[in-house]
């Protein structure tokens, strides 16, 4: 169970950097698990900023890579672009600080999370999400204890999630349902 929770936390953190969302959709009791930098980014969004993010998210399949998406964002709002780049650089610095095994693992999670996005803007496929989580859990379990500890230290929000009993129950239930 401990391993599943760590992986879901990493997936959640990654998804926050891959798929724009509104903090209003997150229950209050879970907001404490979101890194402060991410909370601040979303807290400062205007109605117009949110609309720009929704528009670009619906066109994500048209962007060759993250840089192309950021350029499209810059064309829409220089302020929003600067804030997004600042958040991206924060996350990138954390990932770049990791040793090779941990970095490869996080890069794989990001790639997996990006592959879950629907090209046509429809709802995410729950079964694909479950399978992705199972795949990531298997990869996580194969990591050395040193690498697992490094991930916990680098991403402290994970440590908070690990201790939350309600999240543990929800994660277990979600992954077991067919």
UniProtKB/Swiss-Prot annotation:
Free-text description of this protein's post-translational modifications in UniProt: Not glycosylated.
GO cellular component, one term: extracellular region
Residues in the signal sequence: 1-16
Record localization: Secreted
Major subcellular site: secreted
GO molecular function, one term: fatty acid binding
Family: Belongs to the fatty-acid and retinol-binding protein (FARBP) family.
Name of the molecule in the record: Fatty-acid and retinol-binding protein 1
Taxonomic source organism: Brugia pahangi (Filarial nematode worm)
């Amino acid at each position: 169970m401990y391993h599943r929770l760590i992986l879901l936390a990493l997936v959640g953190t990654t998804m926050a950097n891959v798929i724009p969302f509104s903090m209003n959709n997150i229950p209050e009791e879970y907001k404490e698990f979101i890194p402060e930098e991410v909370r601040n980014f979303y807290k400062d969004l205007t109605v117009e900023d949110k609309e720009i993010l929704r528009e670009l998210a619906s066109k994500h399949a048209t962007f060759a890579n993250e840089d192309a998406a950021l350029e499209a964002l810059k064309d829409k709002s220089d302020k929003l672009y600067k804030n997004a780049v600042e958040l991206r650089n924060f996350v990138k610095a954390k990932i770049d600080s990791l040793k090779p095994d941990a970095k490869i693992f996080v890069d794989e999670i990001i790639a997996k999370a990006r592959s879950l996005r629907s090209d046509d803007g429809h709802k995410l496929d729950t079964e694909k999400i479950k399978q992705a989580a199972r795949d990531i859990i298997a990869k996580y379990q194969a990591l050395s204890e040193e690498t697992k500890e490094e991930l916990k230290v680098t991403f402290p929000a994970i440590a908070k999630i690990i201790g939350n009993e309600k999240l543990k129950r929800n994660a277990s239930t979600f992954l077991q349902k067919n």
